[in-house]
Curated annotation (Swiss-Prot):
This is Adenine phosphoribosyltransferase. It catalyses: AMP + diphosphate = 5-phospho-alpha-D-ribose 1-diphosphate + adenine. Gene3D superfamilies: 3.40.50.2020. It is found in: Cytoplasm.
Length: 173
């Protein structure tokens, strides 16, 4: 049975990475073994009824949550990285961040045609990263069956960009 108020393990950092943005820092949650374990267990419970083959997650904090969930659920893990970080041939997507533009790269053979994918990340803010991840999965012939996030910034209305997708979040601001 779950017992922790996980929101109390999220630290607010005002004006980071730039003025006017409140950064939701999950490192206190990751540092606390009980909170981290409960967060992973609860995120896995959010998607227990979904059928998928792989967990796809972006660096850096997405790796932490995605790899832990893949291990617990007995699934493969696919890392998505920034430019120049993956050693094999990649495909990429550009996207808008809350505070700029970025690219996400994935190995061209990371997902087989028809494989079902769960996308995992730490924070759902504007939905831009999630959209780019969806495009990458589709580009390789995969099917996104669900997206799971530790934190959602609902005041930024990210779900508008993800209409038609099964979106699960644990902590909502």
């Amino acid at each position: 049975m779950f017992k922790l108020d996980l929101k109390r393990f999220i630290r607010d950092i005002p004006d980071f990475p730039q003025k006017g943005i409140v950064f939701r820092d999950i490192t206190p949650l990751l540092r606390n073994q009980e909170a981290f374990k409960e967060a992973i267990d609860r995120m896995c419970e959010l998607v227990f009824d979904r059928e998928f083959d792989l967990v796809v997650a972006p660096e850096a904090r997405g790796f932490i949550l995605g790899a832990a969930m893949a291990y617990k659920l007995g699934k493969g893990f696919v890392p998505v990285r920034k430019p120049g970080k993956l050693p094999y041939k990649t495909v990429y997507e550009e996207y808008q961040l809350e505070y700029g533009t970025e690219q996400l790269h994935i190995h061209e053979d990371a997902i087989e045609k028809g494989q079902k994918v769960l996308i995992v990340d730490d924070v759902l803010a504007t939905g831009g990263t999630a959209e780019a991840l969806i495009r990458l999965v589709k580009k390789l012939g995969g099917e996104v069956v669900s997206l799971a996030f530790l934190v959602e910034l609902s005041y930024l209305e990210p779900r508008k960009r993800l209409e038609g997708y099964d979106v699960k979040t644990l902590i909502v601001y």
